[in-house]
Amino acid sequence: MPIATPEVYNEMLDRAKAGKFAYPAINVTSSQTLHAALRGFAEAESDGIVQISTGGAEFLGGQHNKDMVTGAVALAEFAHIVAEKYDVTVALHTDHCPKDKLDGYVRPLIAVSEERVKAGRNPLFQSHMWDGSAETLADNLSIAQELLARARAARIILEVEITPTGGEEDGVSHEINDSLYTTVDDAVRTVEALGLGEKGRYLLAASFGNVHGVYKPGNVVLRPELLKELNEGIASKYGQPAGSKPFDFVFHGGSGSTAEEIATALENGVVKMNIDTDTQYAFTRPVVDHMFRNYDGVLKVDGEVGNKKTYDPRTWGKLAEAGMAARVVEACGHLRSAGQKIK
């Protein structure tokens, strides 16, 4: 299927909220990990989101130049072509972008889509993330207002993170403490600045104890029920009916989450869940297994010539793709998006 148009992307998000499921947002760093994500979505019969972080884009730009925009645009254009061969609909997104990288990443990418839209085409990416969690909320929302206005004109959705997610993601790090919980006051200030859709659609990465990276169960206290409090607080203040879900929430830092925590988040308006750490492991684990099992073929040991079939990147690359795709299928099951593809 083609990459989602702006209209289809909005439909995807509306369907997720109404159906109480969420789309896995899979970080990719190469054409191979892109295919793994697309394959996983197709096998699960789930639509989904593929995203590129600043670090991923830099890697894609090549180690000689490390140009983030070049890397992101190149993989996005590639995705627009290869996605046609998969019977699911996928949206393209850029992940965490802090203030010091806006001018080298998100702003130029919005400009690319602005030019495409002026020419009567669809935007290259369907959404971009502004991560202002390291800034004061006032500065965060001020920049978000500027980006939201540009995104709306380019038919793009903006994702904002208003309070910190713990751990580290591509150089953006926060301590694990009480600041990891968004308050109703934070939500009110967000709506005052960004509106409730009339200024452009945005996704909200609210914090309810989330932590990026790897952690053991019990080390982090997630409170997904907090999302209900945020929705209720805004619905009450703005005269919306009881049970309204004014926000499109994003779940960051979900590695190690329990099924119950994920279910509670879905019930309260989460429509997108970022997955990176787990799929990185799922991609790499089969490669390690292959290398250990074929050590004397992969390396030229004791004067031998090795075995080309074992060190051919396609041999172990196929295993990596299959491993990551299987983890994407698992994620679709956890998030209830499996079998929910747009017909």
UniProtKB/Swiss-Prot annotation:
Q: Does the keyword Lyase apply?
A: yes
- What are its GO biological-process terms? glycolytic process
Name any one GO molecular function: fructose-bisphosphate aldolase activity
Keywords (alphabetical) are: Glycolysis, Lyase, Metal-binding, Zinc
Q: Which residues bind Zn(2+) 1?
A: H96, H212, H252
Q: Which residues form the active site?
A: D95
Write out the residues that bind dihydroxyacetone phosphate. G213, G253, G254, S255, N274, I275, D276, T277
Q: What role does this protein play? A: Catalyzes the aldol condensation of dihydroxyacetone phosphate (DHAP or glycerone-phosphate) with glyceraldehyde 3-phosphate (G3P) to form fructose 1,6-bisphosphate (FBP) in gluconeogenesis and the reverse reaction in glycolysis.
According to UniProt, the name of this protein is Fructose-bisphosphate aldolase
